[in-house]
Each structure stands twice: as structure tokens, then as C-alpha cells.
Amino acid sequence: MTQTIFMVGARGAGKTTIGKALAQALGYRFVDTDLFMQQTSQMTVAEVVESEGWDGFRLRESMALQAVTAPKTVVATGGGAVLSSENRAFMRDHGRVIYLRASAAVLAKRLAEDPEEAQRPSLTGKPIVEEILDVLASREALYQDVAHHVLDGTQTPSLVVEQILQMLTGEMVK
């Protein structure tokens, strides 16, 4: 199997951590679309949102998603990449999509422990747990819709990677 593997889920679900470990296990390249966008635009997410608004950020996110998609690549997408029906169709058409699911409580705890997440602008202006609950409520169906596989992102990264490898191996056998 050489197709792109897309990791989707909310902020803090483990897309980058698990994506890096998965890429290493497969001998694939790893790309985080948020980091790619920051490097190519020379702006942080907060700066893009401040200067171009969330619509501008989402447009850049879509362009980054398409730019990094390549064989033998694991892509950690931004949490909101699924908001675009074009992005959802693109990911399903160009690879395997894995949704890392986690509860609002787990996500809030992880985000509170990550100093980089403090730099990220709020989507709603609400406290973090409330915002996560709102975001999950609005995106859960989209994550489910786009995903070929749904996994529990609260497990250890090594266990999740092992589960993904087993699923991918099972797909090759079929």
C-alpha cells in the first residue's frame, strides 16, 4: 500500500503524535498541514486568522491539504479540514482516512498541557471545554462521514498505531 493516510479529529486528538509514529512504522513521510501552512505562509495560525479571518485560514488549509498529498505520506489534518465537503471528498478519493476520536474532557486536558495550543485563536470565544463540546457536536458527523476507520484516540499512541497497521494489512489481504 502506498496511498496517503489522512488523520482527522479534533485539536488534541493525537493526529500529529500518532501520525508521526505511524509514518515511522510504515517508512512513510509525515506532514502536518498546519505546520506546512505556517512554513509556506511565514505566519502562525493566529496571524493568518487575524489578517485573513477564519475563511482565509480554511482556504489555506485546503490548499495545504492538496499540496502535501502524495504516495507514502501520513497527513495530520487541521481539526476543521472536514468542514469543507471538497476536503472530505478529496481525502476519501486520495487515500485512507482515520478518525481519532476522543472525549471533550480528554481533549481539554491535552490542550491545557500543550503550550503551543495556547497560541491558537478561539473558534467560539468560549472557555476551552465549552468550545470543545460545541466543536465536537458540530463536527462529529463530518468526522464519521469522511473516515474509513474510527479509532479511540485516548489509547496509547503505540496501541493506536498497531491497530492502524492491522487494519491496513487487513485491507491489503481483501
Swiss-Prot record:
One Pfam family here: SKI
Regions that span the bilayer: none
Cellular component per GO, a single term: cytosol
Cofactor: Mg(2+)
Assigned EC number: 2.7.1.71
Superkingdom of origin organism: Bacteria
Cellular compartments annotated: Cytoplasm
GO molecular function list: ATP binding; magnesium ion binding; shikimate kinase activity
Example GO biological process: aromatic amino acid family biosynthetic process
Positions with a binding annotation for ATP: G12, A13, G14, K15, T16, T17, R120, Q155
Key words, A-Z: Amino-acid biosynthesis, Aromatic amino acid biosynthesis, ATP-binding, Cytoplasm, Kinase, Magnesium, Metal-binding, Nucleotide-binding, Transferase
Function: Catalyzes the specific phosphorylation of the 3-hydroxyl group of shikimic acid using ATP as a cosubstrate.
Protein name: Shikimate kinase 2
Organism: Yersinia pestis
